Amino acid sequence: MKVWNKIPIKDNGDKLIAIPSCLKFLDPHPYFHLGAPYKDKTSIWKLREEVINRLVKVNDYLISISSFNLLIYDSWRPLEVQEFMFKRAILLECEKSDIDISFENIKSYPSILKKVEKFWAYPSHDISCPPPHSTGGALDVCLSDKDGNLVEMGSMVCLLYTSPSPRD
């Protein structure tokens, strides 16, 4: 169980709102095209209002001192999307290891779970410890130049588990 699961989460009532156009985000969303069960394309890009307010301030400052922008790679995820991506990551890890698996016996493969849980929170339905992205308070962000190109930052975590197969 990841450390964040031990931290009780209480909803502070901050509204989940659409990310404004002054912030850049990937379009189309990489998980949408994998078949992640978002209700529709317009429901994808949301965060808690306070998170957005802080991101706007950071982005404005970044633009004022450089030619970079924040580029949001992922934001709020409904629990159904979290579950879809978690299961997909497990299947891809099993495929890489040539393991035939069902979700009923996943606990028999702790090494697979350990790899997946490095990047994906378990899709918990417990309201006291939801996956961070499902709260609307977590996001994945990169830097882009003024033309929208990703800035190399030493890691391509953004692309993990988003290609059609693990061999791509």
What would you call each of these model-derived segments?
Residues 161-168:
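Conserved small/polar residues in nucleotide/adenosyl-binding loops
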Residues 1-9:
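N-terminal secretory targeting signals
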Residues 26-44:
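Acidic/histidine-rich, surface-exposed loop or edge segments in extracytoplasmic proteins
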Residues 44-82, 87-92:
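Active-site acidic/histidine clusters and adjacent loop/turn architecture
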Residues 158:
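Surface-exposed loop and adjacent secondary-structure segments within mature catalytic domains
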Residues 91-135:
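Acidic, His- and aromatic-enriched active-site or binding-groove loops in soluble protein domains
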Residues 67-69, 136-140, 150:
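Extracellular structured ligand-interaction cores
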